[in-house]
């Protein structure tokens, strides 16, 4: 559905995530969301059931998932999580782990365009600024649907 020019604007990365078993006492810390951008991009959320979702350590996708590398990433995440919470170090265990692909562009703007097929539009690759891109993207798409021009369309164009 998308052309080669659009594909050239995107890069694919892998992000890794672990979910802990419930940790008694973690809710008492009242942590909403933590993002550590200094050490290979880590983020965490504490869930109502006392689990922690901890992820990051993003890297370029090489075309095929390397399960050995993924397992090493999960263990690295566990080690880093324990460093963040030394008082819970003995209680932190992985219950689930998973990874996923995401697309980005070099300037972190999404790609919005019309497919070669009738009435099919696309909005791809929100990257690191997904919420901001989404707000802009919705306005651009609504204008495209209505055949109106939009001053920001050129920044999101696959021909930029």
Q: Where on the chain are the PLM-derived regions?
A:
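Flavin-dependent oxidoreductases
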Residues: 1-47
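C-terminal catalytic lobe of FAD-dependent flavoproteins
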Residues: 62-68, 82-160
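Conserved FAD/dinucleotide-binding core of flavoprotein oxidoreductases
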Residues: 1, 11, 49-83
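Generic beta-structure capping elements
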Residues: 21-23, 57, 115
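Short, catalytically relevant binding-site loops at active-site mouths
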Residues: 25-26, 35, 59-62, 101-102
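Short acidic-glycine loop/turn motifs at beta-strand connectors
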Residues: 47-50, 116-117
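Structured core elements
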Residues: 17-19, 43, 53, 93, ...
């Amino acid at each position: 559905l998308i052309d080669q020019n659009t594909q050239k604007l995107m890069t694919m990365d892998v992000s890794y995530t672990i979910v802990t078993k419930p940790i008694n006492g973690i809710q008492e810390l009242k942590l909403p969301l933590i993002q550590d951008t200094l050490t290979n991009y880590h983020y965490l959320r504490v869930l109502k059931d006392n689990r922690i979702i901890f992820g990051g350590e993003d890297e370029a996708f090489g075309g095929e998932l390397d399960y050995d590398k993924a397992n090493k990433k999960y263990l690295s995440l566990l080690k880093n999580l324990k460093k963040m919470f030394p008082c819970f170090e003995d209680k932190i265990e992985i219950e689930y782990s998973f990874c996923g692909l995401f697309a980005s562009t070099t300037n972190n703007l999404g790609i919005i365009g019309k497919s070669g097929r009738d009435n099919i539009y696309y909005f791809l690759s929100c990257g690191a600024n997904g919420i901001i891109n989404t707000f802009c993207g919705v306005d651009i798409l609504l204008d495209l649907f209505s055949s109106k021009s939009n001053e920001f369309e050129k920044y999101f164009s696959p021909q930029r």
